[in-house]
């Protein structure tokens, strides 16, 4: 996708905030524990390479991605630290992953058997993190019998396969009710007990686990949403670490006009002015990730909350202004403006979603500006 460098719409990313959040998490680690920065999905929309380098500078020991190509991109950027692919990958890519020194999550014996043959042919060895499905229902071994069979296979073919880690993912670590979390934790302990030799990494802690369940098992934290300064629970549970949000989303007024009473605005004529009003146009739309359903939400202009009127268009939306503003006046969609703040959570609440999705939806057409 073409990046809109000649349009004054931009995502401002504070790498200092990233570093602060990573350093805060590191300060909470116990002796022998490490931190992997989760930079999948373009670092949750923040920009994978700059964020990864900032996290490394702050002390991150490695990285987590979702797909092979993300891992390769990190390697091509010069990063030599451990990289774990958390997603499912075809065994046909085993040699590719091994050659790029990428560790991979594995949750089936079928992957291991197919990958082993290919790795043997190419004289390569692949690092494995055994995924355990303790209740997420996504990927991983679900019972001790299947897990033991996989462990035995890896040990038998140690020239091609190395068990570097074992892990699970909690589905309710960000919930006020700890019951299901505790059930998953117990299941994890049961499954890990199958391993006669413990691998280098044993991990179950995502951002929410590290925040609200500090006595978690294992020696590795996978720091995801909290690295970007956002509360994993949204606004259900308070976070006390003073995380700093790293992303602001800004644009500007490119058209300002006064319309008379009875004027309709936007596709479908869904808004009609009740009196003479000043209307401003902002050059960002749903093609940039600003959802069409944000009609009626408010943005910040000169410290004033201004309502989005009419439907959000593909490339633009319109706002009702309290007065005439100059062209080029800054519009804040996420972030601070003259002492007022709109958070990613505010946007998510209005859109009936989560702030993860709001961040990831910001398309590549919006340039990321780093400071």
UniProtKB/Swiss-Prot annotation:
Q: Needs which cofactor?
A: pyridoxal 5'-phosphate
The protein's matches in Pfam families, at most eight in alphabetical order, are given as: Ala_racemase_C, Ala_racemase_N
InterPro entries found in the cross-reference section: Ala_racemase, Ala_racemase/Decarboxylase_C, Ala_racemase_C, Ala_racemase_N, Ala_racemase_pyridoxalP-BS, PLP-binding_barrel
Instruction: List the GO biological process terms.
Output: D-alanine biosynthetic process; peptidoglycan biosynthetic process
Main function: Catalyzes the interconversion of L-alanine and D-alanine. May also act on other amino acids.
Give the keywords, sorted. Answer: Isomerase, Pyridoxal phosphate
Family, per entry: Belongs to the alanine racemase family.
Which Gene3D superfamilies does the protein's record reference?
Alanine racemase, Lyase, Ornithine Decarboxylase, Chain A, domain 1
In terms of SUPFAM superfamilies, this protein maps to: Alanine racemase C-terminal domain-like (SSF50621), PLP-binding barrel (SSF51419)
Instruction: Report the EC number(s), separated by commas if there are several.
Output: 5.1.1.1
**Protein name (database record):** Alanine racemase
The entry's substrate-binding residues are 138, 314
The gene is: alr
N6-(pyridoxal phosphate)lysine modification sites?
40
Q: Which reaction does it catalyse?
A: L-alanine = D-alanine
């Amino acid at each position: 996708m073409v990046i809109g460098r000649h349009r004054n719409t931009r995502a401002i990313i504070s790498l200092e905030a990233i570093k602060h959040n990573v350093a805060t998490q590191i300060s909470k680690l116990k002796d022998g524990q490490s931190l992997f920065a989760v930079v999948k999905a373009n670092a949750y929309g923040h920009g994978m390479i700059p964020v990864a380098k900032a996290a490394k500078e702050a002390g991150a020991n490695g990285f987590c991605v979702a797909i092979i190509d993300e891992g390769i991109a990190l390697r091509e950027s010069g990063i030599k630290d451990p990289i774990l692919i958390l997603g499912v990958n075809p065994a046909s890519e085993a040699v590719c992953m091994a050659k790029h020194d990428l560790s991979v999550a594995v949750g089936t014996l079928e992957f291991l058997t197919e990958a082993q043959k290919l790795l043997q042919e190419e004289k390569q060895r692949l690092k494995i993190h055994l995924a355990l499905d303790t209740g997420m229902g996504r990927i991983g071994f679900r019972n001790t019998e299947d897990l033991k069979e996989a462990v035995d296979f890896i040990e038998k073919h140690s020239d091609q396969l190395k068990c570097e880690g074992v892990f699970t993912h909690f589905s309710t670590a960000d919930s006020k009710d700890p019951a299901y979390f505790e059930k998953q934790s117990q299941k994890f302990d049961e499954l890990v007990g199958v391993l006669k030799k413990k691998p280098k990494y044993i991990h179950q802690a995502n951002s929410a686990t590290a925040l609200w369940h500090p006595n978690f098992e294992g020696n590795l934290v996978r720091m995801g949403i909290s690295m970007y300064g956002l509360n994993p629970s949204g606004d259900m549970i308070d976070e006390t670490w003073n995380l700093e949000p790293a992303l602001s989303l800004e644009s500007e007024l490119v058209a300002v006009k006064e319309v008379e009473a009875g004027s309709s605005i936007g596709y479908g004529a869904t808004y009609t002015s009740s009196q003479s009003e000043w209307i401003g146009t902002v050059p960002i739309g749903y093609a940039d990730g600003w959802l069409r359903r944000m009609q009626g939400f408010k943005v910040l202009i000169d410290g004033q909350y201004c309502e989005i009127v009419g439907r959000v268009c593909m490339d633009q939306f319109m706002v009702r202004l309290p007065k005439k503003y100059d062209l080029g006046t800054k519009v804040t969609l996420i972030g601070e403006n003259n002492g007022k703040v709109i958070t990613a959570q505010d946007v998510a609440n209005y859109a009936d979603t989560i702030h993860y999705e709001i961040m990831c939806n910001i398309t590549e057409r919006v340039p990321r500006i780093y400071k």
